[in-house]
């Protein structure tokens, strides 16, 4: 060996989480017993007189038993209400769920809270998507779900069924003439 080279020594250490390092001095060792969540390890190269070099690696283990994204039931509101709570199914740590507005309007208070408040909804359909990131543990089609919050216009005209009618037999048919509802009411 060249006396000018300092071969140094390497050592793996567990910083956080769990894990059994099979050969702590091997740069390419196996690790067993990792816990769900983040597990952080440090690789230290000690070159004695030439100093110490360190780097960390994070290994995140996701829970494969996590359920697919579920944004909750569609909602119907009547103006002037412009606020509601979204009701997605929560996720198991370290998975992350995120709300996004995809059409309509609404301001999401906390995008990562499954039961967040949404304000500034407008009349009509407002669609939100709940996206779950759980590493590669969920199939692509199970990572998102949408919910519709439909706000009806309270300022609708009163129902008007039209004029009363009187008929004489044999005429036993006529037409009903009610007024129209304004969008987005049903009538």
Spans of model-derived segments:
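C-terminal edge beta-strand
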Residues: 53-62, 141-152
């Amino acid at each position: 060996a060249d006396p000018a080279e300092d071969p140094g020594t390497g050592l793996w250490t567990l910083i956080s989480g769990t894990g059994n390092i099979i050969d702590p001095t091997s740069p390419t060792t196996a690790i067993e017993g990792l816990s769900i969540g983040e597990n952080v390890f440090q690789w230290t190269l000690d070159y004695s007189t030439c100093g110490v070099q360190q780097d960390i690696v994070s290994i995140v283990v996701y829970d494969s038993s996590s359920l697919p994204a579920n944004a909750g039931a569609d909602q119907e509101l009547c103006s002037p209400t412009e606020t509601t709570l979204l009701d997605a199914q929560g996720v198991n740590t370290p998975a992350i769920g995120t709300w996004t507005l995809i059409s309509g309007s609404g301001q999401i208070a906390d995008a990562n809270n499954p039961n967040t408040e949404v304000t500034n909804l407008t009349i009509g359909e407002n669609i939100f998507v709940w996206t779950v990131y759980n590493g590669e543990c969920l199939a692509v089609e199970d990572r998102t779900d949408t919910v519709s919050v439909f706000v009806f216009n309270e300022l609708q005209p009163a129902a008007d069924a039209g004029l009363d009618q009187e008929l004489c037999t044999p005429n036993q048919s006529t037409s009903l003439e009610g007024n129209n509802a304004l969008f987005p009411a049903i009538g």
